[in-house]
Amino acid sequence: MRKNEMSTSKQAIQWKCLESKIESKRLHYGRFLVSPFKRGQASTVGIAMRRALLQEIEGTSITCARFCGVVHEYSTITGLQETIHDVLVNLKEIVLRGDSKEDIQEAFLSVTGPKEVTAGDLSLPPGVEAIDNSQYIATITQPISLTIELEIEKDCGYRIENLAKSGKGQFPIDAVFMPVRNVNYSIHLFGSGRATQEILFIEIWTNGSLTPHEALRKASEKLMDLLTTFLYVRGGDVSLFENGEDSLDLTKSPSLQPQFGDTNNLEERVLENRFIDQLELPARAFNCLKRAEIYTIADLLNYSREDLSKLKNFGRKSVDQVSEALWDRFAKELPDKKIVLNRRK
């Protein structure tokens, strides 16, 4: 391999946002470039990213509505222009952004007509907001009161509700938990000969509850969490079960032992490749750690709480934030005393 080909193959893969625009409150667009890849790598990444963007990112949606005195979804209410079915369809399309970790949250709609009812009239729980307050729900043509109790959930993908759960004015709603509306990717070659490499272009359209940049980040985190699982597999954990018989330890087979290798330090190697930006710390704490040359989770675990509190401009609050994020993200705790694993030189 020629010298210029060798240097090209060792270039770090980088990404760049080529275009970002808000076409409407409920339609955001972003186009990204990722390169350089070796031949065949771009399609692997493109396929995985597209599926993760469309299927793995959580969204918030209305999943159930309760009306007082309504028998079935095709009922009508005097003074309400739409049928109950039409109102349910409009509620399904309301775009919400939610940060709560609760399974089910309660919301309600209580208005008096005559009035055009929109998403801005919803009374939503803390941490949940409507992206477009002008989204249409119904029109009240007479001076009547309309009250609807709602359930809001956070999930992935598309959920078809069981209509058997309907009754007594309660109507499950088919929910779309997909912040990403569409994803396209394309691959282009550059270079020549053995130095030929690939550029991956990714286009993302979202419903406004996430920006394309946020969606790309979340999809990347989902893929990393999924694949990191394999790095934690130890030889002694691999077994085969068949027909309820005793497990067969594959690592005892001489022919298979080379496939497992030395797995004792896998966890340490994983942490060396997980960077502190994955803790999503406040800017103050993050910048203080970087100034102290703490770049990875492995670096961070070399410091006790007392050690961190001695860093410049790093107070008790910052230490608590780091400790909480470390536990939430990696189920790790700061050591009681300073230890040295693999400090960067």
UniProtKB/Swiss-Prot annotation:
GO terms for molecular function: DNA binding; DNA-directed RNA polymerase activity; protein dimerization activity. It holds the Pfam family RNA_pol_A_bac. The N-terminal domain is essential for RNAP assembly and basal transcription, whereas the C-terminal domain is involved in interaction with transcriptional regulators and with upstream promoter elements. SUPFAM superfamilies: C-terminal domain of RNA polymerase alpha subunit, Insert subdomain of RNA polymerase alpha subunit, RBP11-like subunits of RNA polymerase. SMART domains: RPOLD. Belongs to the RNA polymerase alpha chain family. One of its GO terms (biological process) is DNA-templated transcription. In plastids the minimal PEP RNA polymerase catalytic core is composed of four subunits: alpha, beta, beta', and beta''. When a (nuclear-encoded) sigma factor is associated with the core the holoenzyme is formed, which can initiate transcription. GO terms for cellular component: chloroplast; DNA-directed RNA polymerase complex; mitochondrion. It comes from Adiantum capillus-veneris. DNA-dependent RNA polymerase catalyzes the transcription of DNA into RNA using the four ribonucleoside triphosphates as substrates. The keyword Membrane does not apply. Residues 1-234 are annotated as: Alpha N-terminal domain (alpha-NTD). It comes from the Eukaryota. Signal peptide: none annotated. This is DNA-directed RNA polymerase subunit alpha. It is an enzyme of class 2 (transferase). Its EC number is 2.7.7.6.
